[in-house]
């Protein structure tokens, strides 16, 4: 199977782009795409997104050969966010935060994951968008 992909980020209304993207090409049929977006109102969102994205990918590379099981993606995210918490604690407890969204392609199977309000969309020609994740944010609280 041939896979082609592209990426694009934009800072939107903010002065700084706090997005961080990683793509792991594990072999010709397995790809991991991860995007983290630093949370507005928190300290150093660009650093937060970089830490979480890299820690998630590090966990993935270290453990993927054991195969994907039910809690694999959750454990990768937990390890990544724990690393971010340790960094925040070293900075005397400043609030650091980021969203994360991604997809793991294994042949014809795709696993989608996300936490926060970063979305993943699935487009299929000629139908257009056929799937969209739901945000994990209650906007009535903001």
Put a short name on every predicted segment:
Residues 1-142:
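PP2C/PPM-type serine/threonine phosphatase catalytic domain
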